[in-house]
């Protein structure tokens, strides 16, 4: 049997990009889809984005680090000692205010790892490492030994992960295939010319009776001005940063001086403290 599987990840709230990817999936005639995590924030999408995901109806959902941060932030559980953590808390507050409570409850149940058997091909699916969905252990330029960690079981043929926002095909030391679909809503690349290409990214893997017969890295154009208009209409926090991302691909998640200025200017730190005081629970985050 022939399977044409759309694999997508790291939407980061970008409704307009995901809608374009979904339309491309339909045009390409995919038979199923797998989602590898990081659905919300910092983009425009909230309940509308969740509703779009229900239309796509992935057979696999994986929980990413930003999914965990949205869940924890919505519960007031991100300690606020750094500007970046205020940023995450304030984004999570915004998502929590706009989605049905069952959305975050459902996300909390998403697994960190799934193993699928497609015909004779055995595939491990994660957001990052099998037991850790954050960090830079699998950045694309790192040694092969790092990627061997994706192959927990000896009988695996293929590992697919996400998180680093780069389309990737490479091999383990045993020449098993490692794939990454890139990012729907927030593509990254240190090479300036490649970073200027801000199309939505995803992957189609075709598997037939003989094995893996196709690996298609897709790039889909969409309207960045339309996404910015949606963000403005949704009154998202940190919209200046989202505008920069839409225009240049730059993100400022770890730009502490800039985040501190915005947190002070718009009262985000005060709002986050008030929100967390209502929940009265503080935990260390991984951000």
Per-range role (PLM):
Residues 56-114, 141-150:
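Active-site neighborhood of divalent metal-dependent phosphoester bond hydrolases
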Residues 72-77, 137, 191-192, 228-230:
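Short aromatic-enriched loop/helix-cap "lid" or pocket-rim segments at secondary-structure transitions
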Residues 97-218:
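Acidic, His/Gly-enriched loop-helix segments that form or flank divalent-metal centers
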Residues 7-9, 33-38, 42, 60-65, ...:
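Active-site neighborhood of phospho(di)ester-bond hydrolases with catalytic His/Asp-centered motifs
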Residues 12-17, 41-44, 66-71, 160-172, ...:
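Active-site environment of divalent metal-dependent phosphoester hydrolases
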Residues 173-287:
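Acidic, His/Gly-rich catalytic cores of divalent-metal-dependent hydrolytic chemistry
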Residues 1-52, 56:
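N-terminal active-site segment of His-dependent metallophosphoesterases
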